[in-house]
């Protein structure tokens, strides 16, 4: 509550609606070691002070680090300042690497059991998922649009849509409901997975449609350009949907996608998700830019070595003091004289 008061003081807003308004939905996200306090003791305190009670108290398990429990006393921890210097500074990757950390922490969130942060896992999440699946799909869609559709959103020729087209459109339209329900159920890992899976569906769709092959058939196949248009129209609408759906998890990336699509951030409103009309036909889009960079093995080795070195440098100093001299023993008869 004090943090809310300070925030309100800094921003000139009222803190009371957040803790006293009966229409407010209050959720307490906690660790499993605080369940008793947040479910029994704290609600009593809130009620006595006239505050609203939490609607739900999702409790997470513990997250370990490289095979051991995190510990500030042993320096077995991750320093945000180090991460900013090593990954987020413009020369090292910029804000997109902030999203990478958010993504990995969500992917391994200990929602139902203890989990573990490893630098190798962090690298794999970035390179194998954000770069190879999410970023790769969006980059391919924009590259092919500029190459095969003059840099503009092509029209959709409904009469030529086949089963795969309809299935992909349906996946886009159902994505909002899937992700939304998982978020409402506090299943953030699964919600984020659905977002990446939609990008995976886009990659598979593009691979099966092969618009680059159709481009070689323009003279022999009168429908080739229309089929290319259909493929890239669907891929671009899927890209716009990825911006909306990824916004809760990858906010910097979502805004970067909006920049590439030349749309205002207003498109990120959640109600727009699932639409196949986010981008207007004939609208010019910007040239593609890579959303994520690969993280090299050398960078990961450096982080692991830094972690181990910091822990070694803070080994606890054991203070040894000589044991007091043992006093002479007494016989039982002397002990029996004591009035207890």
Predicted regions and their residues:
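Conserved, charged catalytic cores of large soluble enzymes
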Residues: 6-17, 112, 138-179, 199, ...
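Basic, alpha-helical terminal appendages of large translation-related enzymes
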Residues: 115, 181, 186, 196-340
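Catalytic adenosine-cofactor/nucleotide-binding cores of aminoacyl-tRNA synthetases and other
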Residues: 61-160, 263-291, 295-299
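Secondary-structure capping and boundary motifs in well-ordered enzyme cores
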Residues: 29-34, 92-96, 122-133, 164-172, ...
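Glycine-rich phosphate/pyrophosphate-binding loops
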Residues: 8-11, 50-63
């Amino acid at each position: 509550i004090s943090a809310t008061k300070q925030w309100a003081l800094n921003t000139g807003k009222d803190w009371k609606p957040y803790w006293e308004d009966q229409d407010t939905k209050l959720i307490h996200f906690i660790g499993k070691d605080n369940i008793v306090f947040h479910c029994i003791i704290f609600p009593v305190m809130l009620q006595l002070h006239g505050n609203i009670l939490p609607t739900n108290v999702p409790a997470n398990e513990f997250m370990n680090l490289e095979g051991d429990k995190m510990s500030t006393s042993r320096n077995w921890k991750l320093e945000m300042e180090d991460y900013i210097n090593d990954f987020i500074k413009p020369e090292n990757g910029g804000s997109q690497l902030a999203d990478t950390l958010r993504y990995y922490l969500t992917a391994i969130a200990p929602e139902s059991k203890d989990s573990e942060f490893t630098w190798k896992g962090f690298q794999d999440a970035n390179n194998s998922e954000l770069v190879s699946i999410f970023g790769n799909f969006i980059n391919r869609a924009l590259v092919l649009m500029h190459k095969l559709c003059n840099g503009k959103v092509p029209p959709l020729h409904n009469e030529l849509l086949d089963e795969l087209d309809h299935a992909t459109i349906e996946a886009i339209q159902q994505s909002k409901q899937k992700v939304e329900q998982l978020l409402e159920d506090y299943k953030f890992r699964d919600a984020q997975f659905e977002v990446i899976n939609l990008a995976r569906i886009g990659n598979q769709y593009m691979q099966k449609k092969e618009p680059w092959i159709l481009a070689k058939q323009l003279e022999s196949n009168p429908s080739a350009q229309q089929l290319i248009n259909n493929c890239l129209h669907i891929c671009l609408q899927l890209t716009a949907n990825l911006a909306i759906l990824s916004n809760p998890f990858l906010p910097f990336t979502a805004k970067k996608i909006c920049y590439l699509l030349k749309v205002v951030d207003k498109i990120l409103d959640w109600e727009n998700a699932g639409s196949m009309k986010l981008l207007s036909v004939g609208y010019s889009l910007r040239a593609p830019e890579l959303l994520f960079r690969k993280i090299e093995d050398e960078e990961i080795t450096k982080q692991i070595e830094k972690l181990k070195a910091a822990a070694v440098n803070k080994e606890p100093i054991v203070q040894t003091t000589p044991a007091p001299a043992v006093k002479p023993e007494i016989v039982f008869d002397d002990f029996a004289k004591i009035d207890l």
